[in-house]
């Protein structure tokens, strides 16, 4: 009996050690993968060998993928609709990568500057919209589940610093309704994936006030969530004169992460970050600093870092590729994965 107990104890320790190694996540939002492929764009590794995007992220040391969902992007090629997401989710599964689903609750981009109601929902009342949001959430997640893919995290909204589904869920005017819509999403997620971690995601990690505004409001109206998601973009913070240097952005974001844990007792995740692609050497330094701060300066409360669209080039200044190949920026992930 004692031998059996000792064997169980040793096995439990091994499992715990493995889980500890995976407790910090290195991820990327590669939602544009199928659109790039449809345009005939070929990605390659640093050696010039052709690679599919998901496989390339795994090769670079990443262990998680984030995929955005649009409600009905028929005017935008149908990319990031339910069926497209299932295709990309299967690739993440094939490469053994954890999956985050990011619901925009819009037919196209949703961010702090625009949170447009999907065309099919525009004439709905608040109560009808709650039901539509929940049904859409269940529909997409059920399709992913039926494909045999586990979902580890689900974002209920994307950068909802000012709420979403404007004007119905605009937080400044209708916090109660924003909270109600958020909780409807939470309940829908748990119906399909009871163990999925539900994230509420805001931008501007340097700024504690915007986080207090949203999360105090959600708490006041009893909206549930499991994790706080943050965006850290030193480039945009400096352009907007919110910070004077990338170091200041990282320092303020780290302080905010630690403060948020104390106040709300929820784990956190950097679900979006990016650095200037034209400066890959400095970019690697910045990304390495973000990863180090999240991993080593938050007492384990920040559980990972996701890069937004590393493969993006041309009109987007914060990708991490040039000529279809990863730059030195991505080495920050590779080195952190060792």
Language model regions located:
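Positively charged n-region of N-terminal signal peptides that target proteins for export
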Residues: 1-5
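Acidic (Asp/Glu)-rich catalytic clusters
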Residues: 22, 52-61, 87-98, 142-149, ...
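N-terminal substrate-binding region of glycoside hydrolase catalytic domains
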Residues: 22-98, 104-133, 139, 243-245
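Hydrophobic faces of well-ordered beta-strands that scaffold small-molecule active sites
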Residues: 26-28, 65-67, 99-103, 152-156, ...
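Active-site beta-loop-alpha junctions enriched in small/polar residues
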Residues: 31-33, 70-72, 104-108, 156-161, ...
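Aromatic-rich peripheral "rim/lid" segments of glycoside hydrolase catalytic domains that contact
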Residues: 38-43, 109, 255, 259-265, ...
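Active-site cleft segment of glycoside hydrolase catalytic domains centered on the general acid/base Glu
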Residues: 80-86, 111-225, 237-255, 279-291, ...
């Amino acid at each position: 009996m004692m031998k059996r107990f000792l064997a169980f104890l040793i096995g439990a320790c091994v499992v715990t050690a493995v889980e500890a190694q995976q407790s910090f996540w290195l991820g990327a939002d590669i939602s544009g993968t199928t659109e790039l492929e449809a345009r005939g764009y070929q990605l390659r590794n640093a050696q010039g060998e052709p690679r599919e995007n998901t496989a390339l992220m795994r090769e670079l040391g990443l262990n998680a993928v984030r995929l955005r969902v649009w409600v009905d992007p028929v005017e935008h090629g149908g990319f990031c609709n339910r069926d497209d997401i299932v295709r990309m989710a299967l690739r993440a599964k094939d490469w053994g990568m954890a999956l985050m689903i990011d619901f925009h609750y819009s037919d196209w981009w949703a961010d702090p500057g625009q949170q447009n109601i999907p065309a099919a929902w525009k004439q709905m009342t608040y109560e009808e919209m709650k039901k539509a949001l929940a049904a859409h959430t269940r529909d997409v997640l059920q399709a992913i589940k039926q494909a045999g893919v586990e979902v580890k995290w689900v974002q209920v909204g994307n950068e909802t610093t000012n709420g979403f589904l404007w004007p119905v869920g605009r937080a400044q005017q209708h916090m109660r309704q924003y909270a109600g819509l958020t909780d409807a999403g939470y309940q829908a997620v748990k119906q399909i994936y009871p163990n999925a971690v539900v994230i509420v995601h805001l931008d501007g990690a340097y700024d504690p006030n915007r986080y207090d505004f949203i999360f105090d409001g959600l708490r006041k109206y009893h909206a549930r969530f499991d994790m706080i998601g943050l965006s850290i973009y030193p480039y945009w913070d400096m352009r907007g004169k919110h910070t004077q240097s990338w170091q200041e952005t990282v320092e303020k974001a780290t302080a905010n992460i630690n403060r948020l844990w104390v106040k709300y007792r929820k784990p956190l995740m950097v679900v979006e970050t990016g650095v200037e692609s034209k400066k890959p050497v400095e970019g690697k330094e910045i990304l390495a600093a973000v990863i180090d701060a999240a991993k080593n300066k938050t007492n384990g409360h920040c559980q990972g870092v996701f890069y937004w669209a590393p493969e993006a080039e041309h009109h987007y200044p914060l990708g991490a590729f040039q000529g279809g190949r990863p730059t030195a920026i991505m080495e920050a992930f590779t080195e952190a994965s060792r």
